């Protein structure tokens, strides 16, 4: 059944390619974008149907499909109570990522843009669907070429430099994971998730495998001092690229922790938790101080993403139900809120004023009241305010860390103070901050219907699951309990 999720975007690529052969007139471009948007919405509907049919009382993989491809190599697809939420996150964000650049892509580049977007959706979903370590690595790395092209073709002035930073940093970091996977395969004779989870690597072997995989995920998260590629990619990327990076790509390492590190290398992950916590706390403090000093809106949101990613990453290593469930909830919440904030910064403010400097804006509440309300709710989420999903995820993640190592838990909790400080500064300076300029009255209008729909989706999801998180937390319970049992 989950094969549909991979085939639908590929079928959409076929349709838009056929439509592109008729020329790139204005009407054809609208049709091409409409086909791509419809395709991604159909994929969202399919994922929702599968979510409804999913049995959350089972800890096993479901809807398993086997497809024989080449000699002695089978491709297994399946989903469990952890991956289903990442699949939903992907299918929710992708239609909005296509919609957010609806008017900004030049006519001659429309076909290339939608093909890259649909291909990215297929590859991202494949990461969450495959049940094989080697295939996980292949699809984990295969998203780099489309992202490279997305930033390199449609980014801003320094797009080529940013795309090369993205490609080289993540590719070199992932080579260590490849070495670990090859070692696993040579020792066990298989790369199947289920078979490897039943293996019992000795401690020294686990240690070397752990470091190889962790380095790859540390670059992808990214941790402090390895985040240069992310900042450049966010700042230079088109809006859709920023949304995909913050909303989905940064969650690949979180998912990889639950698939590769915790169940396959339990001794190493338990014994070296303190190192991960120290790195996480340093990342939180470093990213937070960097956020407090920047005046670039996209850069502020990017640094904020690094800080929140560090929180849900250390929560994942807490070895507690609360910490692991909280890390996934915070990962989902961050996907919604950061995507919404990037739309506010790069899709609304920048499109109208052509600047990302916070000091340029003031008094937006007077000329953009609807935008100000939606921006306010997303800012509350980013600062971890109660009644938002971010609060639940952050509180549970930090609770898990505190249960494991109280001192580092206290230091990690400074993220709450820092996130409130820089988010309040950003919102207050843009929305209030004195009288508005006459330029805003003449050139800036409130959100359009398209922009309102995009922001409303993220606002509703953030608040709805913040008030009623049971569909997420209850659904995760069996899978998380099973994961902790396998670790211990």
Swiss-Prot record:
Core subunit of the mitochondrial membrane respiratory chain NADH dehydrogenase (Complex I) that is believed to belong to the minimal assembly required for catalysis. Complex I functions in the transfer of electrons from NADH to the respiratory chain. The immediate electron acceptor for the enzyme is believed to be ubiquinone. It is a multi-pass membrane protein. It holds the Pfam family Proton_antipo_M. The chain crosses the membrane at residues 1-21, 34-54, 79-99, 110-130, 134-154, 164-184, 207-227, 238-258, 272-292, 301-321, 328-348, 367-387, 407-427, 452-472. GO terms for biological process: ATP synthesis coupled electron transport; electron transport coupled proton transport. Its main location: mitochondrion. It comes from Aspergillus amstelodami. It catalyses: a ubiquinone + NADH + 5 H(+)(in) = a ubiquinol + NAD(+) + 4 H(+)(out). It is found in: Mitochondrion membrane. This is NADH-ubiquinone oxidoreductase chain 4. It is an enzyme of class 7 (translocase). Belongs to the complex I subunit 4 family. It comes from the Eukaryota. Disulfide bonds: none annotated. Its EC number is 7.1.1.2. The keyword Nucleus does not apply. One of its GO terms (cellular component) is mitochondrial membrane. The gene is ND4. Keywords: Electron transport, Membrane, Mitochondrion, NAD, Respiratory chain, Translocase, Transmembrane, Transmembrane helix, Transport, Ubiquinone. GO terms for molecular function: NADH dehydrogenase (ubiquinone) activity; ubiquinone binding.
